[in-house]
């Protein structure tokens, strides 16, 4: 029961709905795909990709997959700890922290991921392929690779002061 409660306060965003077809002997069979992201606004994000014969069913499937596929990202007061790069297949993304009041300067699929993650100030750019699925995967990969100064200090056996200089 506790699991149901935590899932109800997640932000959900639909990124893309696409009609796809399968060609069979009798003609084409159309179905729909949906790409969604979910997040708690506090560093937990997940994405899902669902496919069904009807749009609502595809969206529902992708939301369920997104809730099952969540990762935690270390945030620094609504922005990133440091500049990060992420890549997935042909998509490359670059994200850097921004000062308070900057907002989310990012395009398309990347903006949705950053919004549901709870990042409020960031400068971001997508290079190469802008296929939404690949951009979402690259963004999540980049955010997952980000470490807080505390995490780096613990790994190196140093104090946070020594890490930050």
From Swiss-Prot:
GO cellular component: small ribosomal subunit
Signal peptide: none
Keywords, ordered alphabetically: Ribonucleoprotein, Ribosomal protein, RNA-binding, rRNA-binding
Manganese listed as a keyword: no
Domain of life: Bacteria
GO biological process, one term: translation
GO molecular function ontology, one term from the record: structural constituent of ribosome
Gene3D superfamilies, per the entry: 3.30.160.20, 3.30.230.10
Pfam families on file: Ribosomal_S5, Ribosomal_S5_C
Residue span, S5 DRBM domain: 10-73
Family assignment from sequence similarity: Belongs to the universal ribosomal protein uS5 family.
Function: With S4 and S12 plays an important role in translational accuracy. Located at the back of the 30S subunit body where it stabilizes the conformation of the head with respect to the body.
NCBIfam families: rpsE_bact (TIGR01021)
Recorded domain comment: The N-terminal domain interacts with the head of the 30S subunit; the C-terminal domain interacts with the body and contacts protein S4. The interaction surface between S4 and S5 is involved in control of translational fidelity.
Subunit annotation: Part of the 30S ribosomal subunit. Contacts proteins S4 and S8.
Protein name according to UniProt: Small ribosomal subunit protein uS5
Gene name of the encoded protein: rpsE
